[in-house]
Amino acid sequence: MTDVLTTASLISEESRATATPMMEQYIEIKANNPGSLLFYRMGDFYELFFDDAVEASRALGITLTKRGQHMGHDIPMCGVPVHAADDYLQKLILRGYRVAVCEQIEDPAEAKKRGSKSVVKRDVVRLVTPGTLTEEKLLSPTESNYLMALARIRGSAEAQFALAWIDISTGVFRLAETTLTRLLADIWRIDPRELIVADSLFHDEELRPVFDVLGRVAVPQPAILFDSAVAEGRIARYFNVSTLDGFGTFSRVEMAAAAAAVAYVEKTQIAERPPLGAPERESAASTLFIDPATRANLELVKTLSGDRDGSLLHALNRTVTGGGARLLAERLMSPLTDPERINARLDAVAYLIDDVSLCDGLRDALKHVADMPRALSRLALERGGPRDLGAIRQGLVSAEKIAVILDGGLLPDELAKALRDLKALPGALEAMLGSMLADDLPLLKRDGGFLREGANPELDEVRALRDQSRRVIAGLQLQYADETGIKSLKIKHNNVLGYFIEVTAGNADVMMATDEAKARFIHRQTMAGAMRFTTTELADLESRIANAAAEALTMELEAFERMVEAVVQQAEAIKAGALALAVIDVASSLAYLATEQAYCRPIVDASMTFSIKGGRHPVVEQALRRQSAGPFIANNCDLSAVNGGKNGAIWLLTGPNMGGKSTFLRQNALIAILAQIGSFVPAEAAHIGVVDRLFSRVGASDDLARGRSTFMVEMVETAAILNQATDRSLVILDEIGRGTATFDGLSIAWAAVEHLHEVNRCRGLFATHFHELTVLSEKLGRLSNATMRVKEWEGDVIFLHEVGPGAADRSYGIQVARLAGLPASVVERAREVLTKLEDADRKNPASQLIDDLPLFQIAVRREETRKAGPSKVEEALKSFNPDEMTPREALDALYALKKELGKA
């Protein structure tokens, strides 16, 4: 089946002209949904055909078969059962596929009325894409599921790019301006499952590196979706308002991104409209800038191998609700830069630490909170069931209990606002759902039985009739068994025959022994080992049961719709209450964590201070405790301004391999992040002057797919740091200059230290094995030497994992090599070579360089030139218009420029 018709050839005129009626319908629907696998409903299965079938069978690991021929080719086919469709959708979505779900929208009996060859009407009811999921099975309860739109407007004084992101499962809708420089960092911060972009922009070479990194997450869409001229009207129509003035002020490029996101939601949800919150604008300056390399190196929400276990988020997470877990992850990805907002969060955590019984009471109550935002979204999109209504009911009940627990004290601002939002939840809705819904709820509304007995007296009567009839059937079975003497006689039911009497083939003669018996027991079906009969009274009873059951279900479904309508009308209050519960969950979980792990409250302000006493690595410390491997060795770090200066310090860290340099670097970056999300930190004391940008170049990696070696990746990331770090930034660099010749590496590291000190003027930690760099501390006033301490004992090296002042004179690489198991002969030869190299170095010590080289003068001079603005020659060149000059005028101008350069 290798020769398969492609979608392009499938939708040709020749293809349609030769197709059967059913296949013609399929081709038409497929043509309207390019780029998506088409789940085509046929009875109890979703079928896929042609190249969709080949692709899906490979991705799902299901059998590929065929269904006839088309245009002389076999038609590949595979299918999945409707009842298990969510499981298969999940696999496809995880692999980055998009699926168009095509349902039968009329009863087959209606189609037959139009003629024997008529095809059942079908249409796509939904496009399932990674960024527009709502089903519980397809979503992680602890992770947001964002759809993002990227827009760009050229020739505008406004920011060139904007991002809008929506989680239709919770109603979150946010937008922000960005720049090309920070575009990828902002995308990674939000971590969308799907990013839509205008097709013209998708093929822009300037953005090719961004889309290469994103892979299948980025999806081109028609440029018309991003038209800023109609953006405001599109958003206003979605929210059913005449003006967006009540939402705030947005730039043109922000509106273009927001409108594209809304248009894509409408496109994928067909006729349904999820209850989105009003768009909220985020300022780039309000969050800590963390570039993609730093996020990966620090393993904030997942490890370098892609696992959640072992990440900072995994070490922090003590939340007990899905909403709380999502909010904690969101905060960790976007630390704040406003000390006032940070301290408001810290106040809430401190309040709950001080009142242990309150914290424990809240956490116990929060364990019963259901995921109201996601249940609300499914109900609004008509994908919800009775259990979603039950989730709203349970959430409202729990919220009321939590409000009672929290009420009564003088609460900090964050908890006080949460309490107000909980009190604003609709009590009448809670009472209505409590009185209507049964305790045990079915998954699907079509199963019925979700209304409480007593909620509707008329329904109770119909149910009694239905249930009584079923008891009558049990009585009939006993009666017929006695009449015939067949003890094994059973009354059964299926969707084809309805209720019927079944006896074994050996007992069938008794049922037809006399004319009277034949008249009473009417033969219906002969099976291999059994025969089936019915009676007039059984048929009458079946009719009554069917009517009663149908009537009961109709009444329940009508009540279901009324309850859904009541819930959706309170969508804003429910979402606000759910957010309040998430805020309380995060605050109480961080309080619990701080008590459990002995964290301290950091001082966070607008100063340039960076002082940590007894700091610890939050992830490594917990790992050591789990392994009973002894305590984590705490260390101090002080990068505060030196001698009353206004710029922070840089530590040059030397020491042995395995001494703990990388751990020390990372732990200080993580402590800064924890402080700025509003968490207590693993230290005895900490004072963090807000960091605006965090850069980390730790660990080695390559990018072979893009033709970049480990050294090239290191240089690219270092270049980004040196070009973007400000005086308020925190920079941690580990072993810059590896992977090239020794002198090349030393030179690069040397120049990088100078640049960080004199141009960036940032706070930083610079770990290196180039001990020659330690002499820089004699000339660079804010540079201090620090080292990882070790002890030597009888030829062995003992790593103390302690940081102290001073410089290491050795890296102990040979000792580490011996510990790793290198052959003894290799280790001994390495010692001999090292001795010779050290003797040579003593004859030309690096300390001479400090006097021979004009340290950092080039960097300073270039910085001064850049700040001074354009020269007279540059100004003159700007004023020239060559098209309007005669040859003589051009020559005179050239002489004038030469004269000006001579003066310079």
UniProtKB/Swiss-Prot annotation:
Alphabetized PANTHER family for the sequence: DNA MISMATCH REPAIR PROTEIN MSH1, MITOCHONDRIAL, DNA MISMATCH REPAIR PROTEIN MUTS FAMILY MEMBER
Residues at which ATP binds: G655, P656, N657, M658, G659, G660, K661, S662
Gene Ontology MF terms: ATP binding; ATP-dependent DNA damage sensor activity; damaged DNA binding; mismatched DNA binding
Protein name per its UniProtKB record: DNA mismatch repair protein MutS
GO cellular component, one term: cytosol
Taxonomic lineage: Bacteria, Pseudomonadati, Pseudomonadota, Alphaproteobacteria, Hyphomicrobiales
Keywords of the record: ATP-binding, DNA damage, DNA repair, DNA-binding, Nucleotide-binding
A Pfam family annotated for this UniProt entry: MutS_IV
Family under the similarity heading: Belongs to the DNA mismatch repair MutS family.
InterPro entries: DNA_mismatch_repair_MutS (IPR005748), DNA_mismatch_repair_MutS-lik_N (IPR007695), DNA_mismatch_repair_MutS/MSH (IPR017261), DNA_mismatch_repair_MutS_C (IPR000432), DNA_mismatch_repair_MutS_clamp (IPR007861), DNA_mismatch_repair_MutS_core (IPR007696), DNA_mismatch_repair_MutS_N (IPR016151), DNA_mismatch_repair_MutS_sf (IPR036187)
GO biological process, one term: mismatch repair
